[in-house]
């Protein structure tokens, strides 16, 4: 290789290095300008129907819908870890749900709150019981005046068909390892001791519910208890009681979320993290204490 050829290669290498440096510099400036303009998006997570534990499942027999705790948790995790998701808008249209599934989702919402990303709640037609448990975890809650919400309380039900079994001449018998192994059996009456045990469970979960609302809404626990008798409230009534922050629809909540996340409210982009697969709620789920 001649000296002239070497000089050409050195010059070419210098040009390439300079171009790379300029590219890195311009990229950094572009990113800085992007952050300065507040670019990014609002992550939107939807909770529709009753909240249940486990994964989304397909069932040709099921015409009902609901929200899987595992799916909602996955979406919330992605929104929390996504650096471009500057705020999270959770649209809730749910009448109730299982306690464990609701608490799982609530824990993911706590992690988002700890990351300092704002969570804005938009209530749909109904955001009651388990739906309100989750709503109370948000930084700010929007509802429509006629939204059905509240229903702060816990219940556990069971059916006893002992008399019916006697009428049709069918007898149920079982072998069990302990006196209470078949508690909630529909084939025998509940004992007084069992009723006390179950009432204790319901009372414990009720206290957890009340404490969650009191903490989330910065309310005195006794004040929450005074309205935590299962009553249904309109959105306007809930606002008067301190359970809702403002009247507004989905887009009002979206604008507030964008503003809270430092985004341009005139050019809001949204992103959802839902699976593309169409799933239906399984009919066959175990018994659970419900909110």
Predicted regions and their residues:
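Short gly/pro/ser/thr-enriched loop/turn and capping motifs at secondary-structure boundaries
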Residues: 126-129, 148-152
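N-terminal organellar transit peptides
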Residues: 1-127, 140-143, 157-291
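Short glycine-/acidic-enriched loop or helix-start segments at secondary-structure transitions
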Residues: 101, 131-132, 153
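Alpha-helix C-terminal capping segments
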Residues: 133-139
């Amino acid at each position: 290789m001649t000296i002239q050829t070497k000089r050409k290669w050195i010059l070419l290498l210098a040009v390439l290095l300079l171009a790379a440096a300029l590219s890195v510099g311009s990229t950094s400036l572009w990113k800085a300008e992007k952050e300065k303009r507040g670019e990014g998006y609002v992550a939107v997570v939807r909770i529709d129907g009753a909240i249940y534990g486990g994964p989304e499942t397909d069932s040709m027999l099921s015409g009902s819908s609901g929200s899987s705790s595992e799916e909602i948790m996955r979406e919330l995790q992605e929104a929390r870890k996504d650096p471009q998701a500057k705020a999270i808008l959770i649209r809730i249209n749910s009448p109730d749900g299982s306690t464990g599934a609701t608490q799982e989702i609530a824990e993911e919402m706590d992690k988002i709150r700890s990351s300092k990303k704002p969570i804005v709640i938009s209530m749909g037609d109904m955001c009651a019981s388990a739906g309100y448990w989750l709503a109370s975890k948000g930084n700010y809650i929007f509802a429509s005046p006629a939204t059905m919400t509240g229903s702060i309380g816990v219940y556990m039900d069971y059916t006893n068909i002992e008399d019916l079994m006697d009428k049709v001449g069918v007898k149920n018998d079982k072998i069990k390892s302990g006196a209470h192994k078949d508690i909630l059996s529909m084939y025998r009456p509940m004992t007084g001791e069992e009723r006390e045990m179950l009432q204790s469970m319901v009372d414990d979960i009720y206290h957890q519910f009340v404490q969650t609302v009191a903490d989330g809404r910065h309310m005195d626990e006794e004040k929450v208890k005074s309205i935590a008798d299962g009553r249904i409230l309109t959105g306007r009534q809930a606002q008067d009681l301190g359970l809702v922050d403002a009247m507004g629809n989905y887009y009002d909540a979206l604008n507030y979320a964008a503003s809270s996340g430092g985004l341009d409210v005139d050019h809001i982009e949204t992103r959802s993290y839902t699976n593309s697969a169409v799933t239906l709620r399984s009919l066959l789920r175990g018994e659970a204490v419900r909110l």
